A protein has these predicted regions:
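Conserved beta-strand-loop-alpha-helix junction that forms the acyl-donor binding cleft
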Residues: 119-130
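Helix-loop element at the rim of GNAT/NAT acetyltransferase active sites that forms part
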Residues: 18-33
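A short, internal acetyl-CoA/4′-phosphopantetheine-binding micro-motif in the GNAT/acyltransferase core
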Residues: 86-96
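Conserved catalytic-core motifs of GNAT/GCN5-like acyltransferases
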Residues: 122-123, 139-150
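A conserved beta-strand-loop-helix scaffold within acyl/acetyltransferase catalytic domains
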Residues: 31-54, 58-59, 67-78
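Conserved acetyl-CoA-binding loop-helix of GNAT-fold acetyltransferases
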Residues: 96-109
Length: 151
């Protein structure tokens, strides 16, 4: 049975690294130009200041998924705290089960406890999970475009 736990960055990051690699391989754009190179120091600072939230999905002791969220007051709406999804990943063997909706539901519960007004998720157009978001009561809010311009 999969359970969900809030975890601190410094205690989970080593376990997350193999899943981060799989996640990058599955969804990253511009792989020929941009390699996976997370700023772990920044994540640690954000965790220490309370603006980072990590929800782990575990089957027994095995990490099978994570949802990393940034929590902060929105610069446009200073009276409201937003929870902005950074990354969400569930091992392929646990997809199309109850794990994803249970994870989102647990995250919503935890964010409500923290005084969050709005939760946002983003997804790749070639790896959508719109049906999950709509099932969970989320509204499609905006589109985003991307273009690699460095070289």
């Amino acid at each position: 049975m999969v359970r969900f736990e809030e975890e601190k960055f410094e205690y989970i990051i080593d376990e997350m690294k193999p899943l981060l690699e799989k996640h990058y391989d599955e969804i990253a754009m511009y792989k020929d130009q941009i390699s996976l190179n997370p700023n772990y120091d920044l994540y640690k600072i954000m965790d220490d200041t309370g603006s980072l939230h990590i929800l782990a999905a575990r089957d027994g002791t095995v990490l099978v998924g994570y949802c990393v969220t940034f929590i902060n007051y929105h610069p446009h709406y200073k009276d409201h705290v937003y929870a902005v999804n950074d990354v969400i990943y569930i091992d392929p063997g646990y997809r199309h089960t109850s794990v994803a909706p249970e994870m989102v539901s647990e995250l919503e519960r935890l964010m409500m406890e923290k005084g969050v007004s709005v939760m946002t998720f983003h997804m790749k157009t070639y790896k959508p999970f719109e049906s999950l978001m709509e099932m969970m009561g989320f509204d499609k809010a905006e589109y985003m475009y991307s273009k690699y311009i460095k070289d």
